Amino acid sequence: MRRLNRKKTLSLVKELDAFPKVPESYVETSASGGTVSLIAFTTMALLTIMEFSVYQDTWMKYEYEVDKDFSSKLRINIDITVAMKCQYVGADVLDLAETMVASADGLVYEPAVFDLSPQQKEWQRMLQLTQSRLQEEHSLQDVIFKSAFKSASTALPPREDDSSQSPDACRIHGHLYVNKVAGNFHITVGKAIPHPRGHAHLAALVNHESYNFSHRIDHLSFGELVPAIINPLDGTEKIAIDHNQMFQYFITVVPTKLHTYKISADTHQFSVTERERIINHAAGSHGVSGIFMKYDLSSLMVTVTEEHMPFWQFFVRLCGIVGGIFSTTGMLHGIGKFIVEIICCRFRLGSYKPVNSVPFEDGHTDNHLPLLENNTH
């Protein structure tokens, strides 16, 4: 009884077979079919290689949410060279809460030579070229995010020559921690001193003819310092054409959380608008000579996550490629063969075999016998 039930079960399973086997003796091969098969296998191989390269690649996913962190401090990373001696300039930050952050809290004043060496000029040229490409091709920013901590540092390389020229500039570099409110980082004449109504700079002690706010921004970023990330103002160089010249940068800072397979960092992106003008009180152009970077923080936070195609999706796409090519090439081969047979007059519903002679009862023969099924009487 068990054997009978087992046979019935096997018979039922065989009837459900969706892949019936055709005996090889019933299969007819042809040159056209072999050619189509070669084309199909070649196409499948190429598409499989391309699909595998897509599977190995990653992409960046952007998500937006409201920034709810108001209590933490904002870090400003600075590396600026000004074409004035260090004793003549001062840098500090003053925010909307009238909180002053002095440069002594984290900035270093280092005498330097404003003109770059040949190697440094080449570095600056490449950085400016990269900046121009980033402004045209925004998708390159994803490549920069993925290459963080893997690419070479974007910092200005040290001078390779021992220049005998005396320092004529001041390199101000380091970092400051400020409140997460709008503020103004500025470099102007004279050291800053606090007073009840804000702060002031001792500009009266500096000769007006020594004013020169030509400057080069080697690096400016907000948040955690991430090597190999190129920021909008990196490599910027401005040459002053007048002693009383003001350079203004209006910066909008966007908090950014970066999560890749290599790093995870809380940093900030920013956009900038530049403006420069000559101070002339007689002409109505009021202000103070110097470099002013006015920043404001966006209320939105961006989360950038590196993602990868899951294996199951890669497998499904691969099956789709193989099955689709087999079905499509088989259908196209059948249609093509059908058309060729019609054009060449080889398509026929039956088989025609001519009969040389058919004898009649009276002894005559007729060589023109009409077509009969199987040519039989």
From Swiss-Prot:
Lineage top rank: taxon: Eukaryota
Lumenal side: 55-319
Primary location class: endoplasmic reticulum
Membrane-spanning ranges: 34-54, 320-340
Lipid bilayer topology: Multi-pass membrane protein
Cytoplasmic compartment segments: 1-33, 341-377
Keywords: Cytoplasm, Endoplasmic reticulum, ER-Golgi transport, Golgi apparatus, Membrane, Nucleus, Transmembrane, Transmembrane helix, Transport
The keyword Transmembrane belongs to this UniProt entry's keyword annotation: yes
Gene Ontology cellular component terms for the protein in this record: COPII-coated ER to Golgi transport vesicle; endoplasmic reticulum membrane; endoplasmic reticulum-Golgi intermediate compartment membrane; Golgi apparatus; nucleus
Keyword Disulfide bond among UniProt keywords: no
Xref: InterPro entries: Erv (IPR045888), Erv_C (IPR012936), Erv_N (IPR039542)
GO BP of this protein: endoplasmic reticulum to Golgi vesicle-mediated transport; retrograde vesicle-mediated transport, Golgi to endoplasmic reticulum
Subcellular location(s) per record: Endoplasmic reticulum-Golgi intermediate compartment membrane; Golgi apparatus, cis-Golgi network membrane; Endoplasmic reticulum membrane; Cytoplasm
Record's subunit section: May form a heteromeric complex composed of ERGIC1, ERGIC2 and ERGIC3. Interacts with ERGIC3, the interaction is required for the stable expression of both proteins. May interact with EEF1A1.
Biological role: Possible role in transport between endoplasmic reticulum and Golgi.
Name of this chain's protein: Endoplasmic reticulum-Golgi intermediate compartment protein 2
